[in-house]
């Protein structure tokens, strides 16, 4: 079994609202993040991602369940592993009139980190050449990279990033994505919480999808995609009749404009053969390639606290 840097068992968090009513934010979450690579932590807004991260970092108290970081029980043992963890959970505060370098130098002195770590952090996040510019002149993407640089001053083994690309333009998203890849290549394990699924698919090696505070699926990205539905887009002269024939033939199908989409792992020849027996001739039969966003939407549709859990990890 791979070494786990993060492990939660039955993790639960219940809040009381202003009227004193209980609200479940995290409902018995079992999370396992292996060492190495980039692990996506995915879920709709309000699914419990940030609450889970805050509990792992000792910023919120769990109602019940257990948590372990590097095999150490937390929050009790958190001080012994804190130097191995870097995290960007909320927008950090930097001095606007200091340069990026000056901000990092000040923080390094506070943390007791050697001055050489400032150079390493600046280089790692790609701020070389802009590190002497004032913080207030930075773009949002550069500010996010400086925030990541600050977490690297203690040379962490685990980096936790909560929605690091929120509000960024495409160029800023690409910069953060490249930074995450570089960190992973250097041996840092990254837990990436995000809802920008196309970006996650490009950078993550594994992922956990949660909904309503509970795990819905977990595994490598390839395993998650293989576990989702596949199918074909069918172009035919009479889509209404084709939809009826396919439905009566046991296929799950739906029509969008003049195209019939069939959700099935059966061969495409089965579809064309069935249609041909009803004198429906296929003009085009195109395999549908499942992406992470499609799988995510399929998995979280109608999700409830009592919904099924899928663990596709092998």
PLM region spans:
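ABC transporter nucleotide-binding domain
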Residues: 177-263
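Short alpha-helix boundary/capping motifs
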Residues: 111-115, 173, 236, 265, ...
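ABC transporter nucleotide-binding domains
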Residues: 3-211, 217
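Residues at or immediately flanking beta-strands
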Residues: 66, 99, 231, 281-284
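Short, flexible cytosolic linker that couples an ABC transmembrane/permease module to its adjacent nucleotide-binding
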Residues: 120, 222-226, 309
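C-terminal coupling/interaction segments
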Residues: 2-3, 264-314
